[in-house]
Amino acid sequence: MIEVTFTPYDVLLFRESRPFDAGSESVARSIIPLPQTVAGAIRTLLFYKGLKNCVGVGEEEPEFTLVGIAIGTEKGRIYPLPFNIIKSEKFYKVVNPGRFLGKLILPPKGKYKSGYVTESILEKYLKGELKEVEENKVIRIEKEKRIGIKLSREKKVVEEGMLYTVEFLRIEKIYAWIEDPGCGIKDILSSYEFLTLGGESRVAFVEVDDKTPDIFNRELGSTKKALFYFSTPTIGKVGEIVQELEKRLNAKIDDYLLVSSRPTAISGWDMHEKKPKGTKFAIPPGSVLFVEFKEEVEVPPYIKLGKLKKLGYGLALGGIWE
């Protein structure tokens, strides 16, 4: 596995999936980059280098595997706050499931408020050792608003009344983890100082390291009560995900509970067909799947679940809970 670090030159814009037209929709909002955005930048570079087999021309997925991505700050890699960490007065408290008539339930305590936590806090959470998080330890992504003016495509002049607001993200780092089947991705990326990301072609400087992050090498031991924290969007229905998990771990699940929010819409532009991709819906990052196995199972540090795994979707970090 190699780790690629992108350092954006300036603010970033990854537009949400809904249509935007200056004047009729006054705000162009940015979302946190999807894994396929990073995969697309790498596929474009490989295509430019003539490595069509590695790109997967005409295929939805490439030959290489983007294990997942994370964003970062000066504190290092950060991850979406798990959905079972609930805001109280001065702290964010971890709320684990209880039982009701043989079913796992989540007690209704407080409200979820989105944010990010450092890798060290997340690792403590995955070990089942985290009870609460101080409010000042929850990280927010800085947004910057700027004014845009629509230009006529034909005349290249300003169109009257077509002003709009653009909401950019100030992201310091984007990390990507790649499994390379022999495409020479490390050497190719190392020869470039920067790449462009997304349809807006925002510049980001590139660094490559072949050291696997510690979060992928954790030892959790065996347990009947495990959790799987989705750090990237996971495409698929929860029932399908549970069945896949049983098959991959060769273990029967007695009960499960997904703590999540509304699905994330995933779209994009098909460079081969030159048309928009169909919209898919995914379990959002930060979601947590609590499971009870019939027998003790060795919990993996991470596992890929759902569809389009090679595009970085479905990265689930293993953990335990009591």
UniProtKB/Swiss-Prot annotation:
Changing residue 144 to Q: Still cleaves target RNA when assembled in the Cmr complex. One of its GO terms (molecular function) is nucleotide binding. GO terms for biological process: defense response to virus. Its main location: cytoplasm. InterPro entries: CRISPR-assoc_protein_Cmr3, CRISPR-Cmr3_IIIB. Keywords: Antiviral defense, Cytoplasm, Nucleotide-binding, RNA-binding. Changing residue 160 to Q: Still cleaves target RNA when assembled in the Cmr complex. It is found in: Cytoplasm. One of its GO terms (cellular component) is cytoplasm. Gene3D superfamilies: 2.60.40.4350, 3.30.70.2940. Transmembrane segments: none annotated. Part of the type III-B Cmr ribonucleoprotein (RNP) complex, an elongated RNP with Cmr2 and Cmr3 as the base, with Cmr4 and Cmr5 forming a helical core along the mature crRNA (39 or 45 nt in length), while the complex is capped by Cmr6 and Cmr1. The 5' end of the crRNA is bound to Cmr2 and Cmr3, while Cmr6 and a Cmr1 subunit (Cmr1-1 or Cmr1-2) cap the 3' end of the crRNA. CRISPR (clustered regularly interspaced short palindromic repeat), is an adaptive immune system that provides protection against mobile genetic elements (viruses, transposable elements and conjugative plasmids). CRISPR clusters contain sequences complementary to antecedent mobile elements and target invading nucleic acids. CRISPR clusters are transcribed and processed into CRISPR RNA (crRNA), formerly called psiRNA (prokaryotic silencing) in this organism. Belongs to the CRISPR system Cmr3 family. This is CRISPR system Cmr subunit Cmr3. It comes from Pyrococcus furiosus (strain ATCC 43587 / DSM 3638 / JCM 8422 / Vc1). The gene is cmr3.
